Every structure is written in C-alpha cells, then in structure tokens.
C-alpha cells in the first residue's frame, strides 16, 4: 500500500514505498498499483541487477584463462610418456573447444564447430589417462563409459543417454557444470558394424549405437533418466544440452593397419626379431596415415566419423617407453609404491634389471602401461600385507629374479641382517 500523509495545505503527501522519502525529496515518484517507487530506488535496483548480470557473466567465463596448447601439453608430459603427436592434437583440440564455449557465451556471430576427438591406439598406450588428465587440467567434470555396454533404444543394455547421467553424477548433480564436461567413450571400435556394407538385420550393439550417439555427440537436448536404466513414458527426465560437452572416443582398432596396408600397398620385409621391429614401426607409421575411408571400411558409419573431426593415433609402447612410464611420470607406479612404503618408514629399491623384466613382461602380455601396475601389485601383495605389522624392516629390494622366478624380495632389517 502506498504511503500517504496529510500535507500542510490539506493535500495528501506521497512517499516512496521502498525508502520512505517524501515526493518533494526526490526527483520523481513512479506509481504502480497501490505502490510508489522513487528514482533513487530505481537507480539502486538497476545497479543490483547489473551486478548480478556481471557475476553471471563471470561465471560463464570459467574458461577465459584456459591454459594455451603449449601449457596443456607440458602438463600432459608430466603424466604420459611419449605420444607427442597425440598430445599436441589433444592440446589444440581442447583449447579450441573451450574457446568455442566462451564464444557461445559471448554470442559471437562466428559459428565454430565442435572438436570431438577419436583416439586410436593399442591397449594400455595412454588413451584413458590422456582424457582424464585433460579434464583435470581444465577442471571440468569427467566421465568414462564403455561403448560395449551401449545398445540402441528398445534392446537389452544401456541407452546412450546414460552416458550423460554419469557425467551429471560426477558433476555433483550440477547440470550446468556437466554441460561443459568431458566424456571419454572407450572401446568405440567394438561398436563398428559387422561389415562395411549396409546390413538388412539389426546390429543393436554396432551400427545402431553409432546412430544413437550421433545427435548426442553433435549437440542436442538429451532427455536423461534421472535414475538411469531404460526410458519409459511416465517418468520425468533431466534435460541436458550436449553442444558444449567434449567427447573423446578411443579404441584399439586392431585390424585397421591391415586395411590401411591394403590401401597403401605397404609390404614388410625382414627376418625374426628384426621383422617384428620393422612390423611395429610400420604399424605406427601406417596408423598415422589413417583416413576416413579406412574407418568406414573398418565399420564406422560416415555420419559418425563426420562428428569426429580430429583423429589422433598413439604409438605401440616398446620396452624403453614402458621403463620410462614405470619410473618418470608424476604418478608413476614406482613413485606410488615408493611413497606407500615411505609412510611405513621403509625404503623401496628396484634393480634396473628388475625394471627391464617388468617392461618385457608387460609387452609379452600385450597389456601396455596398465599392465605395469598389475605386475607390481602381484609381486608386492605379500609385502604390503606384512610390512604395516612389522617395525624391523628398513629396505625392500626387488631383483630380476623376483619377477622371473617368483623368489621372495630381499629384506634389509634395521639390525643390518638380511633375509633373502
């Protein structure tokens, strides 16, 4: 209700309903239904609204100081050994993607397309670690999903929308944060269609999934079941805009070198171990020559490849690279176990020949970098079980025989006695 009081001449005096100032004390009083507001209160309201707008603009400019490609690669170098070409491609793609997000927020006239990425490389070559590290660098939510668990709608398996749900959960249910996150879809080569010609039968975990993923990867408003599982008509959905979610897809694409070889006519000449070395080098060289037609021949549909403008290949890891991976990265297996034993006041020493054998065994198992941890977990299990309850151990020494012959690691006791 507007405030009115009797004036000296008998007329009603009007007051601002907000600050209480009389009509004579302000420049203007604007009337509404039963209320009045003065020009000063209007100015104050405008300032508050402008401040709110600035704060929301600042919030949308989360990536105004995104690290440049050189800085991104420098951080990747601390966690992933080798793979320079892939790291450069990822650094540029991620930088441009989040610059694109900022342009969207600023309502730019220039439409920059999404930089979704396809990583091609053997198991354990660092695809997942690269994607995880990128998300940490940019400080955005991250989710990993397995393409083999996905099927098209109406069949047993997960709907493709569930990959968005995992990102929302990792964003602490903040949809706005999830909408600028990164999703890594692993084993995407497993959803290749069964032949390079169109099939008249349903391929529910292959081409059907590729078709279902198209819109989500390109950018759409996805209806996500809040509890996961299959969608049904009577439930409410979370609506998520995927246009600013960066999708990184990875796979081993085991038969791809043969497809490239048949196109390029490359032949391998050599004998014994020399032949194996040449084949490994040729394989890496071949993979670098991959073109969309090769991926179509492999079983990815053209529309799907069209949503993945950046293709980066990772090299097969050799013994020297695996030894570096074992020792050098910030979170290397060696550094992690060294730190774990330091917390028990025990020194951990790996002989050089032991590291050689670990790398050779990982190569033999074809498990790549992730195989290193599995090997060390196996040899360290009994030690990690016993050491916390023992206070007499000063040092643990791992020799080559521990790896090859399963002998017990050497323990140096604080009394300087040695138990083999």
Curated annotation (Swiss-Prot):
InterPro entries (alphabetical): AAA+_ATPase, ATP-dep_Clp_protease_ClpX, ATPase_AAA_core, Clp_ATPase_C, Clp_protease_ATP-bd_su_ClpX, ClpX_bact, P-loop_NTPase, Znf_CppX_C4
Gene3D superfamilies associated with the record: 1.10.8.60, ClpX chaperone, C4-type zinc finger domain (6.20.220.10), P-loop containing nucleotide triphosphate hydrolases (3.40.50.300)
One function term, GO molecular function aspect: ATP binding
A Pfam family hit: zf-C4_ClpX
Nucleotide-binding recorded as keyword: yes
Annotated binding of ATP, by residue: 122-129
SMART domains reported for this sequence: AAA (SM00382), ClpB_D2-small (SM01086), zf-C4_ClpX (SM00994)
Any one biological process term the GO annotation gives: proteolysis involved in protein catabolic process
Record domain ClpX-type ZB: where: 3-57
Alphabetical UniProt keywords: ATP-binding, Chaperone, Metal-binding, Nucleotide-binding, Zinc
Binding site for Zn(2+): 16, 19, 38, 41
One CC-aspect GO term: HslUV protease complex
NCBIfam families: clpX (TIGR00382), PRK05342.1 (NF003745)
Family annotation (PANTHER family): ATP-DEPENDENT CLP PROTEASE ATP-BINDING SUBUNIT CLPX-LIKE, MITOCHONDRIAL (PTHR48102:SF7), ATP-DEPENDENT CLP PROTEASE ATP-BINDING SUBUNIT CLPX-LIKE, MITOCHONDRIAL-RELATED (PTHR48102)
Family to which the UniProt record says this protein belongs: Belongs to the ClpX chaperone family.
Subunit relationships: Component of the ClpX-ClpP complex. Forms a hexameric ring that, in the presence of ATP, binds to fourteen ClpP subunits assembled into a disk-like structure with a central cavity, resembling the structure of eukaryotic proteasomes.
Protein's job: ATP-dependent specificity component of the Clp protease. It directs the protease to specific substrates. Can perform chaperone functions in the absence of ClpP.
Name the record gives this protein: ATP-dependent Clp protease ATP-binding subunit ClpX
């Amino acid at each position: 209700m507007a405030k009115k009081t009797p004036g000296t001449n008998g007329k009603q005096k009007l007051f601002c309903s907000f600050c209480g100032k009389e009509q004579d004390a302000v420049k203007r009083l604007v009337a509404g239904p039963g209320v009045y507001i003065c020009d000063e209160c209007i100015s104050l309201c405008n300032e508050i609204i402008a401040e709110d707008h600035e704060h929301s603009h600042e919030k949308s400019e989360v990536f105004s100081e995104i690290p440049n490609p050189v800085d991104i690669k420098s951080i990747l170098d601390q966690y992933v050994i080798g793979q320079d070409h892939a790291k450069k491609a990822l650094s540029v793609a991620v930088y441009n993607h989040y610059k694109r997000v900022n342009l969207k927020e600023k309502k730019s006239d220039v439409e920059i397309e999404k930089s979704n990425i396809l990583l091609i490389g053997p198991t354990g070559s660092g695809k997942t670690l690269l994607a995880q590290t990128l998300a940490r660098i940019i400080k955005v939510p991250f989710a990993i999903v397995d393409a083999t668990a996905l099927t098209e709608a109406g069949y047993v398996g997960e709907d493709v929308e569930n990959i968005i749900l995992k990102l929302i959960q990792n964003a602490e249910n903040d949809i706005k944060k999830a909408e600028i996150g990164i999703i890594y879809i692993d084993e995407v080569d497993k959803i290749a269609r069964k032949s390079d010609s169109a099939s008249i039968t349903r391929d529910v975990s292959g081409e059907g999934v590729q078709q279902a993923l198209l819109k989500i990867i390109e950018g759409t408003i996805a209806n996500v079941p809040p509890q996961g599982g299959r969608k049904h008509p009577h439930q409410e959905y979370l609506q998520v805009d995927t246009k600013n979610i960066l999708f990184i897809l990875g796979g081993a694409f085991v038969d791809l070198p043969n497809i490239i070889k048949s196109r390029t006519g490359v032949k391998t000449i050599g004998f014994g171990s020399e032949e194996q070395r040449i084949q490994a080098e040729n394989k890496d060289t071949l993979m670098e020559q991959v073109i969309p037609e090769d991926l179509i021949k492999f079983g990815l549909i053209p529309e799907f490849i069209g949503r993945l403008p950046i293709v980066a290949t990772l090299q097969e890891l050799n013994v020297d690279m695996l030894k570096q991976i074992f020792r050098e990265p910030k979170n290397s297996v060696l550094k992690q176990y060294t730190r774990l034993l330091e917390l028990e006041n025990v020194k951990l020493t790996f002989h050089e020949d032991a590291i050689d054998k670990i790398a050779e065994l990982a190569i033999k198992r074809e498990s790549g970098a992730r195989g290193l941890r599995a090997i060390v977990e196996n040899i360290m299990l009994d030690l990690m079980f016993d050491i916390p309850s023992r206070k007499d151990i000063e040092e643990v020494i791992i020799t080559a025989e521990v790896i090859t012959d399963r002998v017990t690691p050497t323990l140096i006791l604080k009394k300087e006695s040695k138990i083999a």
